[in-house]
Amino acid sequence: KGMALLDIGCGWGYLLIEAAKKYGVKGVGITLSAEQCAEFRHRIQAEGLEDSLKAELMDYRDLPKSGYTFDRVVSVGMLEHVGRPNYQLFVDCVNDVLKDGGIFLLHFISALKEHPGDPWIKKYIFPGGMVPSLREMLCCLSEDNFHTLDVENLRLHYHKTLLCWAKNFHKHLEDERKMFDERFLRMWNLYLNACAA
């Protein structure tokens, strides 16, 4: 209760809202998306959590000069957007704002070994994205003296997640057609189903 929690790549803010409601954390979420930041701020207000949570439009590289310090740091599904040349910088920035004895939870999609990634996904789905290997992330973390306490492989869970996303995608296809062209919709459908396979 009362711990300071940072969510790097907080998206729409659900993780922090639940943590504030269930565990009484004081949290900050950072994102590069102005739309997500605005919606997260709206949700903070709607939940009456203005004294507990803050949404910031901020790059993780600006954390060291932010003046913030945290007991806990989480990052869920954002590392893939950092890029291999910046993995160590990312870990360094976390280290700069994490209090001594703090805990860092890093959730990411990983590969068995380092590779450049799927060319189609890199071109059409996640330009600039990169899937790190567990080995290279453990090396980066050890450079800042992080001690790995647990590693969990969620591969089978993610298969189910992708199938749910694909089902939801098809359920709302008519609404999506108002926002995206058929080419994009076919690509997104292929991406979800190919990754689930």
Predicted features along the sequence, with ranges:
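Conserved class I S-adenosyl-L-methionine
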Residues: 2-9
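Conserved SAM-binding loop of SAM-dependent methyltransferases across substrates and taxa
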Residues: 12-23
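Conserved SAM-binding loop
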Residues: 40-41
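Conserved SAM-binding strand-loop segment of SAM-dependent methyltransferases
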Residues: 48-60
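A short acidic, Gly/Pro-enriched loop at the edge of an enzyme's catalytic core
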Residues: 61-73
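A short glycine-rich, Lys/Arg-flanked "PGG" loop and its adjoining helix->strand segment in the class I
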Residues: 88-100
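Conserved beta-strand signature within the Rossmann-like core of class I S-adenosyl-L-methionine
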Residues: 101-109
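Substrate-binding/catalytic lobe of Class I Rossmann-like enzymes that use SAM or dcSAM, i.e.
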Residues: 109-197
